[in-house]
């Protein structure tokens, strides 16, 4: 059986539209660069789709495994407690989802963290501001 990866890009959500726009755009960039991957964005609170609705969005896509990636810079309570609880992950960041009557493995990625690519982006934003 051919593996088909799904990516769940997780945003915090906000009453304002900006967080949703950014997370959705990042998910769209990933989907365009990796056309063989199914990408969905979901939000913890104050934005739609919710995480549950985003997971439902994998129905009919044929995904055989899903990576959930928090689009957050650093770990905090949402990353270490809330999202793992919502996704029913074990202590190793693993779990399963039922999609189209099949059990699909789910793994939890780290937040973005400190990375040279982010440092380059910060410097780019500084240059744009000057």
Curated annotation (Swiss-Prot):
Binding site for Co(2+): 12, 78
Record keywords, A-Z: Cobalamin biosynthesis, Cobalt, Lyase, Metal-binding, Methanogenesis, Nickel
EC number(s) recorded for this UniProt protein: 4.99.1.3, 4.99.1.11
Catalyzed reaction equations: Co-sirohydrochlorin + 2 H(+) = sirohydrochlorin + Co(2+); Ni-sirohydrochlorin + 2 H(+) = sirohydrochlorin + Ni(2+)
EC class: lyase
Pathway(s): Cofactor biosynthesis; adenosylcobalamin biosynthesis; cob(II)yrinate a,c-diamide from sirohydrochlorin (anaerobic route): step 1/10
Molecular functions (GO terms): cobalt ion binding; nickel cation binding; sirohydrochlorin cobaltochelatase activity
GO biological process, one term: anaerobic cobalamin biosynthetic process
Binding site for Ni(2+): 12, 78
Binding site for substrate: 48, 73-78
SUPFAM superfamilies assigned: Chelatase (SSF53800)
Pfam families: CbiX (PF01903)
Location of the active site: 12
NCBIfam families named in the record: F430_CfbA, PRK00923.1
Function of the molecule: Catalyzes the insertion of Co(2+) into sirohydrochlorin as part of the anaerobic pathway to cobalamin biosynthesis. Involved in the biosynthesis of the unique nickel-containing tetrapyrrole coenzyme F430, the prosthetic group of methyl-coenzyme M reductase (MCR), which plays a key role in methanogenesis and anaerobic methane oxidation. Catalyzes the insertion of Ni(2+) into sirohydrochlorin to yield Ni-sirohydrochlorin.
Sequence similarity: Belongs to the CbiX family. CbiXS subfamily.
Assembly, per entry: Homotetramer; dimer of dimers.
Name of the protein in its database record: Sirohydrochlorin cobaltochelatase
Organism name: Methanosarcina barkeri (strain Fusaro / DSM 804)
């Amino acid at each position: 059986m051919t593996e088909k990866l799904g990516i769940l890009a997780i945003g915090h959500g906000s009453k304002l539209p900006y967080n949703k726009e950014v997370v959705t755009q990042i998910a769209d960039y990933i989907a365009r660069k990796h056309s063989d991957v199914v990408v969905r964005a979901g939000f913890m609170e104050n934005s739609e789709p919710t995480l549950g609705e985003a997971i439902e969005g994998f129905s009919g896509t044929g995904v055989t495994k899903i990576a959930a990636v928090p689009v957050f810079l650093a770990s905090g309570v949402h990353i270490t407690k809330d999202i793992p609880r919502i996704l029913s992950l074990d202590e190793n960041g693993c779990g399963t989802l039922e999609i189209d009557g099949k059990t699909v493995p789910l793994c939890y990625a780290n937040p973005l963290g400190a990375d040279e690519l982010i440092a380059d982006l910060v410097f780019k934003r500084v240059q744009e501001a000057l």
